[in-house]
Amino acid sequence: VPGNFNWNLWQGQTPDVPYLEERSHYTFRWWYEYSGGQMTDWGAHHLDIAQWGINSLPVEITGSAKYPSVKNGFNVAVDFDASYRYANGVVMNVADNGRNGIMFTGEAGRIFVNRGVIQGKPVEDLKRDPLPREQWRAYSFDNLKRPPRAGKLDAIINHMGNFFDCVEARERPVSDIESQHRSVSTCHLGNIAMKTGRTVKWDPEAETFPGDAEAQRLMKRDQREGFETDTGVA
């Protein structure tokens, strides 16, 4: 263990295991003890945007995955596919392959978006009437004269700046705590469905799997003595 690294403290409530460099930064992401693999790593970014568009909550999730088989090695899903059905009827598919981003498909066309790109129809129509560049520059990281707050349709480049602006103005940031909770919860739901290997039913209001003891057990984990927290999960 590196001399300046408190391995016991770093493990927190997870099981105490011998130090292994791969279990710490950066690769802790590929161990279920500490993270949720690509589903929670990149998924939290993309599902956040996707659920802004869906404007509903998932009620049924189906998942399948392949897992590594190396002893004492990475244990998160490496090949995975999850399908979410939302309360409003929308279906969202999440997979480990394909372009890194979100594809919205509707009656009027398709739009691809990620954290730096938005393209497709009707987005291409904006080339004839583009968004003012000043709107995009306004929230750049180094703009100390950025507007005090963002409107609903303003482009937000500096999320940290938007957060501090909203703290000062007592307003809701473009990416608020509720949407973040729902985004990461949706990622975990996908992992739970993949672990069970079947379809699970989800009550988004009660935040439980009704009548599904197996899935419900995966909502929490055993907590190591000295690091217990009250999660509120039964």
What are the roles of these predicted feature ranges?
Residues 83-155:
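NAD(P)-dinucleotide binding in Rossmann-like oxidoreductases
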Residues 7, 11, 47, 51, ...:
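Non-transmembrane alpha-helical segments in soluble domains
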Residues 5, 75-79, 97-99, 106-107, ...:
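Short, solvent-exposed loop/turn segments at the edges of secondary structure
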Residues 1-22, 121-124, 220-221:
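Core domains of carbohydrate- and sulfate-ester-processing enzymes
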Residues 75, 165-234:
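C-terminal helix-rich "cap/oligomerization" subdomain common to oxidoreductases
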Residues 18-21, 56-64, 91-94, 111-115, ...:
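Acidic/polar loop patches that form or flank catalytic/metal-binding clefts of enzymes
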Residues 32-40, 66-71, 143-153, 166-179:
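Active-site rim elements
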